[in-house]
Amino acid sequence: MQDAITSVINTADVQGKYLDDSSLNKLKGYFATGELRVRAAATIAANAANIIKESVAKALLYSDITRPGGNMYTTRRFAACIRDLDYYLRLATYGMLAGDPSILDERVLDGLKETYNSLGVPIGATIQAIQAMKEVTSGLLGVDAGQEMALYFDYICSGLS
């Protein structure tokens, strides 16, 4: 996992260069939003269970997926879906705090699509639930922090598409 600082420094180091204006501006932007990201992470942590509950209700609860024969039918499958959504919320929050999505590649996306396909997990429904989680989280955090967090939910959805 990298953070925005490590990413900028590693890029310059590989090129054998000092940080240029563009690199320094990236760091300034990262530091300028630090308090916003920390407050957002605290709000998400305090409300994670409700975020998941509202997201499931909004996207999945009353769809065919939860009815007999659907992929979330049976308590075990439903619980696995809830567990996965909680995992995505937590890792997206880590990425937002770091200012870098690499943790999502390393711990979520690498091999996930293939795993879901092999298990018969409907990717479309997963993306729909993540989009609902983005909406719920954005409503809770407000515009600025919601937009920041949305980048990481969108990154997960893009990786699953």
Curated annotation (Swiss-Prot):
Gene Ontology cellular-component terms listed: chloroplast thylakoid membrane; phycobilisome
Source domain of life: Eukaryota
A UniProt-annotated Pfam family: Phycobilisome
Residue(s) carrying N4-methylasparagine: 71
Alphabetic keyword roster: Antenna complex, Bile pigment, Chloroplast, Chromophore, Electron transport, Membrane, Methylation, Photosynthesis, Phycobilisome, Plastid, Thylakoid, Transport
Membrane in keyword set: yes
Topology class, membrane: Peripheral membrane protein
Record function comment: Light-harvesting photosynthetic bile pigment-protein from the phycobiliprotein complex. Allophycocyanin has a maximum absorption at approximately 650 nanometers.
Protein name (database record): Allophycocyanin beta chain
Native source organism of the sequence: Aglaothamnion neglectum (Red alga)
